Structure formats: structure tokens, C-alpha cells
UniProtKB/Swiss-Prot annotation:
Coiled coil: none annotated. The gene is yhaM. PANTHER family: UPF0597 PROTEIN YHAM. This is UPF0597 protein YhaM. It comes from Salmonella paratyphi A (strain AKU_12601). Signal peptide: none annotated. One of its GO terms (molecular function) is L-cysteine desulfhydrase activity.
Amino acid sequence: MFESKINPLWQSFILAVQEEVKPALGCTEPISLALAAAAAAAELDGTVERIDAWVSPNLMKNGMGVTVPGTGMVGLPIAAALGALGGDAKAGLEVLKDASAKAVADAKAMLAAGHVAVMLQEPCNDILFSRAKVYSGDSWACVTIVGDHTNIVRIETDKGVVFTQADNAQEEEKTSPLGVLSHTSLEEILAFVNAVPFDAIRFILDAARLNGALSQEGLRGSWGLHIGSTLVKQCDRGLLAKDLSTAILIRTSAASDARMGGATLPAMSNSGSGNQGITATVPVMVVAEHVGADDECLARALMLSHLSAIYIHHQLPRLSALCAATTAAMGAAAGMAWLIDGRYDTIAMAISSMIGDVSGMICDGASNSCAMKVSISASAAWKAVLMALDDTAVTGNEGIVAHNVEQSISNLCSLACRSMQQTDKQIIEIMASKAH
């Protein structure tokens, strides 16, 4: 139907968004280990009795302090146990969506019995690595995930190797829809958003549905640090204005509260992260409601936000010391600016100001406090948009911001790729010392 109207570049953009914007139940690093455990358990006939798991330092960092949905418990061991005992290996990032109350109870009992061990993989050259080895009687199965949260590269049992990705890995890399992001630009992304048929991108409205539901849940319950509901109370006390800026702050942080606090609702993720998906979605939704945008305008704004966030994050490691809520919020800035103004220059100025503002915020692991980073990133995005609407932005004479937005993005990402690697090691060392 509309495929005939879409040129190959635009089709690649759509495929990239479909690849990177997916539903995810629970923080994606523990969920990656849960998926490995579920896939391993699926290879066994008997009941899983014991689990040994190994993860990369970055995955350990992002799994130590976050609540696993439906369990009320924090950390990687409960994720591995519930994945093995109640997970659906075919559900990807929603591996735990159908876990029963009995599976949760059995997983907790397995932990209490000391039958789950999660260790650092040493040495480990992969930023994202999870391996689960599950045992049932004399049988065992082991599944390894590398590079991406759901990318299973090896399945092995006591009877031999069942699957290995090594043979077709190079071919898969060539056909990845994300390859187009290495040689495109924000201008091309904006041209796509302005002209692509609505029906081709209607699917992105699911992000508003899922992340909007998370936001509502965050305001209903006392999830995580309950930042969103706390700020509502302060509005009622007269300590915060009830305006658009506050609405962006409250509704975005509420979604992250629910996400990190263990609510059993999926987030629409971006680049493998629920919080990045929330940050790229909710601020745009709030502004769209404020300006009275219809579904088509909302879809175009969300597509610009999510694709811009993916485009920027594609220049980063999958996990790093840089808090990627900041880069997702750069996408949100683009989407919000488009809704109000629509011009490329306004969008570029907003992103440049974001880079001059929140760049360098560290990622010290997934936890309830992510909602604070999400909220400050969303607020910074709106501030940058307001500045751009007044033809004001951080200029190329200041800090790491360059005279064009593409170079500014490159400068920011080079920090995470090179200079912040030592920062990441120090963060992991500090967090590991607290665990002993």
C-alpha cells in the first residue's frame, strides 16, 4: 500500500525505529539475564534446581539496584530465578510478563536456599554480556547473550552445542537496519518526519499508549521515589506552579517511578532502555496535548523524538558512564520543538543547548533514582526548546558545543566512547565496594 511511496532511506528509518522501540517489562539489564535463564530453562525437561550466572561489569552495574517487576525484590539473582521458573523465552524483553504468583514464590524460595549465584564475567570485553547456566538433576543448559539485551549468541546443554550465532553474525551485521544511521543526518530525519505517510508511522502511537499508562500508574501508587506524586502534592501546596513545564516534569518522572519501582506494566523502550523510551515519549505527549495536536501530529513528533534519540545513541556504546536519559531527552527536545515551531534551526538549537546543559551526567546503575535523572533531562529539554523559540542557544564558542549540531553530537558521544571509560570503571568499583 504505502510502501510504494516510501524511498529506501525512509524505509530504513522505519525499520530502525521498529528495531529499537519495543515494549519491555522491567529494567532491561536484569531482564536480559532473565531472558538468558528462561531460554536455558526451555532446553531442559525437568524443574530448574540451581542457577549460575555471569554478567559484564556494566550489566552488573545496571542490575544491582533495580526492582524486578512483580517481585518486590531488587537485583539480578531474583531476575535470573524468575526467568528460569516463570519466564517466556519467546517474549524477548517481556520475558516476565506472564510469570505467575507461584513462579515468584518459587523464585524467592530458590534464592533463600542459596541456589542462585550471579558473578562477574572475568575477563569480559563485552559491554553487554549475560550468561545463565541452569541445572535440573544431572542435566544442564547454558545460554549466552552478547551485545544487545536479547541477542542470544550461544545455547549449549550437557548433550552439546544447540545453537551458535558465530556463523551468521557478520551477515546479520550487514543487514541491520541501524546501519543507515552511520551516514544520515538530523536534516534527513526531519525531512522524513515531515513527509512520510501517516499510516507508515502510526505504530509509534503505541509508545504514547504504553508510556502514558506507566505515567498514570506512577501517579496512582507510591512507586520508587514517587517523584511524580510528590511534585503533585507540592503543586497543591502552592510550592510549584501548575503549568506546562511542571506537567512535563511530573508526568515524565511518574512514568520512570513506576518503571523503576517494579510496576507490572511494560514501557515502550528506546535503544534497549525503558527510561530512554519514557524520556523520548512523555514530554512530547504533554506538549502535544497542550497544543491540541491530533494523532498524526503526535505520531510525527514521536517519530522525530525516537528516531533522533536512536540516531544519537547509535554513536554511543550500548551501556556507558553517560546517562542516556540525556540523549533521549535531546530527541524529546526535537519532538517538542517540531510541535511548536517545526523549523530545523529551532530543533538544532534546542539539541545544542541540551549538549551544553546536561552532558556529562553519569550513569551509576539502574535504580529508583533514575527517575530523577529522567525528570531533570526532560526539564532541560523543555528549557532548551523555550530558548530556541527565542532564537537563543548555547553557541559553538562554548564548551563542547560546536558551530553545527552534528559536530556537537559527535563531541558529546566521543566523551562516552573514550574519556568516560575510566569514569565507568570507577563507578563500578564504588558500587561493588558497597555490595560487600
